Each structure stands twice: as structure tokens, then as C-alpha cells.
């Protein structure tokens, strides 16, 4: 089995992408698997991507981080400043990308998880559907698309089904759901 690939779309300054990396790394270790994964974070803002690549955050932006997470995944680099440890930073690649205008996708491989939270809300309903269809083309055949709750209402991408629980808005291909192989 190859590595797990995750795309954090609209990742801003990287907090979401690094949180996904921490979550995936922990889940793989808890499952007794060697953590083999990569996270790709994309955003339209060059400044945000520059900051994401640095991986340095103020304590005030990390209020939900517990002591164990600080110890395992961050180094203190100044007063109230923390940097994501190099091992984790190496697993996360950040790219400047505009999903509306990029003709050839920067994401070359099929993704197992596409995480797109709070980005679609800025688009009209028809454009949201168009973008979601575009994103599904980047999914591995057993992949999962996770959207912000309420970003896509009363519509499901063709060939996909919503995954339980209803507290999240996630979709996977119908064949995958029927076979019980969802991520």
C-alpha cells in the first residue's frame, strides 16, 4: 500500500494542513502502521503560502493545542512563538494555486482525501457545483471529499454519496460506499 495523500484546499497560512498532518500521523501510528503520507496545501495568496511554509505560529493562534501536541510536533522558537518540527514540515508541501484559473492542475496525483472547508461559501451555487465536480476528478477511486457543513446543500456530485455521520459533509464514490471501503 502506497502513501496516503491529502489536499488541503484554501489552506491559508497552513494551520489546517499541519493539523491534518498531525491527525493522519497519529491515526497511522495508533493503527500500527508506518506513517507514510503527504499533505498538499494550496491557497491563492502568496503571502499566506510563504507563512505556511515557515510553519511558525503565535501561542494565541494555538489555543486548542494540548501539551502533548506541543511536545511532539512543535519547537519553541521565541517568546510566544512555535514552529512545526522539521519532520512534520517535510510531509507538507505548500503551493500557490487559484482553482478558478489554473488550467493544468498543480495536483498531479490522485488524492485520498480532499479537505475544502469554508472556501465554497464565497461562490454562487452553480460555481460551487462546478468546483466540486472539478475536485472529484482529483480523488482516488476510494477517496473522500470533505466540505464545510452547509457549503453544498440539496445537491450531491454525480456518482457520489454522502458519508455518515451528518455532522460532517463528506462524499465518496457510490461504488466505494456500497462496498464499505470508505476512508
Label the model's feature ranges.
Residues 9, 30-115, 119-127, 152-154:
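Extended basic-aromatic, gly/pro-enriched interface segments that bind polyanionic ligands
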Residues 3-14, 40:
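Conserved class I S-adenosyl-L-methionine
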Residues 141-149:
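Conserved beta-strand signature within the Rossmann-like core of class I S-adenosyl-L-methionine
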Residues 13-31:
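Conserved SAM-binding loop of SAM-dependent methyltransferases across substrates and taxa
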Amino acid at each position: 500500500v502506497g502513501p496516503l495523500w491529502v489536499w488541503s484546499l484554501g489552506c491559508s497560512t497552513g494551520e489546517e494542513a499541519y493539523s491534518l498532518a498531525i491527525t493522519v500521523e497519529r491515526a497511522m501510528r495508533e493503527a500500527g502502521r508506518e506513517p507514510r503520507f503527504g499533505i498538499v496545501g494550496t491557497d491563492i495568496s502568496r503571502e499566506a503560502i510563504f507563512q505556511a511554509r515557515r510553519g511558525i505560529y503565535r501561542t494565541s493562534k494555538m489555543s486548542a493545542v494540548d501539551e502533548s501536541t506541543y511536545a511532539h510536533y512543535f519547537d519553541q522558537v521565541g517568546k510566544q512563538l512555535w514552529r512545526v518540527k522539521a519532520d512534520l514540515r517535510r510531509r507538507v508541501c505548500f503551493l500557490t494555486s487559484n482553482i478558478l484559473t489554473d488550467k493544468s492542475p498543480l495536483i498531479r496525483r490522485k488524492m485520498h482525501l480532499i479537505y475544502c472547508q469554508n472556501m465554497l461559501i464565497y461562490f454562487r451555487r452553480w460555481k460551487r457545483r462546478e468546483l466540486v465536480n472539478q475536485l472529484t476528478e482529483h480523488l482516488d477511486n476510494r477517496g473522500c471529499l470533505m466540505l464545510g457543513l452547509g457549503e453544498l446543500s440539496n445537491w450531491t456530485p454525480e456518482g457520489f454519496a454522502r458519508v455518515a455521520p451528518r455532522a460532517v459533509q463528506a462524499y465518496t464514490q457510490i461504488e466505494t460506499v456500497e462496498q464499505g471501503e470508505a476512508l
